[in-house]
């Protein structure tokens, strides 16, 4: 590998998925692997130590703070942020770095695909990615993993867990967008994501997203109307119509359900924290 890459993996209670994740990270031969364990109560840390000596255990922390802790600990300019449910193929890190350099981005997120489609929810999620996410180029909003970063950008901006402790993507990228002369977006590399087929896990994930959306609205009140439109109109109405027109029927149901659940928890969180 021409450039040295650090990999940061932030996890909590991920014993079921972490080993395969780290095997595939190791297969890509990064210069270092850093695992930030959010004080797991299972075998997460034990599994992490099989693949790296650089395991950081945090206490009374959150995902937003843990991401910055991992980034701060990295010794290289190029850092890949990988989560426990991501499944790399050999060469993915080099390809993701190529996307970063070719586009002169400070952050590039990969395209996404489902590691295994076991039911309509898995298929709907993958169809949604193909419709709305897997479009390479500069973007206004991206996710923070799986992604490649230039460490130097963190001289100008940091992950901030003040209020936004649950979901970090929206707050961080929104603040990044306000910096002059920065480019970020989606690359050509496609990385697999392993989600279970359990309906309750998807409901839990949508609730988690909605709580994060509510925190974002409290922190950035000027963006609240846009977020409300996103979850009350775009997700449950506009996205399903577009999905049906593109014959992505599973995506229509997936977006509708996600929009309703996220909107509910966004409202609950906004009202609770505003009280």
PLM feature segments, named:
Residues 114-117, 130-149, 164-165:
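A recurrent flexible, glycine/aromatic-enriched loop bordering the glycosyltransferase active site
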Residues 24, 37-45, 86:
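A conserved acidic beta->alpha catalytic loop
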